[in-house]
Every structure is written in C-alpha cells, then in structure tokens.
Amino acid sequence: MAIKIRLARAGAKKKPFYQVVVADCRCRRDGRFIENVGTYDPNKNPAVYNLEEGKTLEWLGKGAQPTDTVKQILKKVGIWEKFVSPAA
C-alpha cells in the first residue's frame, strides 16, 4: 500500500479549495483518505496554506510520498527543509 500526501478538491465550481490529505494511492482524488493534514486556498491573493507541521512531518517520516504540487507547497511553508535536514 503506497501512501501519498496529495490534494483533495472541494469548494464550488470555478472556486476550488483543497484539503491536503494522506491517502492510499489507489483511492480516488476526492475519495477515502487516512488523515487530513491541512488546507490550501488558491483563491486568496496571496494563496493561503494551513498545514499541521507535526502531522505532516510524522507522515513524511513514516514514508508517505508527497505529490509534486504538495512538495512545492511544503517547500513554500518550510516543512520540506525540516524533513530533509532535521535538527541534530
């Protein structure tokens, strides 16, 4: 079972709002997920990112693979650097 950290779309037509979720890669985009770790709202200017750092780092440590888009979000928020080079 491959675990991914990915975006699940919500919101109205033409006004997307995304939940950052941990899910099995075989599940549908907006289907079943294991845990919700944050949100992403691209409609705001600038875009709003709300991620729970502890949960995200925990899942990355367990081997969950972020999608390319989520990886870019993690870099913008600063979580990816904490995962790649943990404080000694």
Curated annotation (Swiss-Prot):
According to the UniProt entry, its GO molecular function terms are: structural constituent of ribosome
**Pfam families given for it?**
Ribosomal_S16
Asked whether the UniProt record includes Cytoplasm among its keywords, one would answer: no
The entry's keywords = Ribonucleoprotein, Ribosomal protein
Q: Which GO terms describe its cellular component?
A: cytoplasm; small ribosomal subunit
Q: Name one GO biological process term.
A: translation
InterPro entries cross-referenced by the UniProt entry = Ribosomal_bS16, Ribosomal_bS16_CS, Ribosomal_bS16_dom_sf
Superkingdom of origin: Bacteria
> Any transmembrane segments, and where?
none
Q: Which family does it belong to?
A: Belongs to the bacterial ribosomal protein bS16 family.
Q: What is this protein called?
A: Small ribosomal subunit protein bS16
Q: Which gene encodes it?
A: rpsP
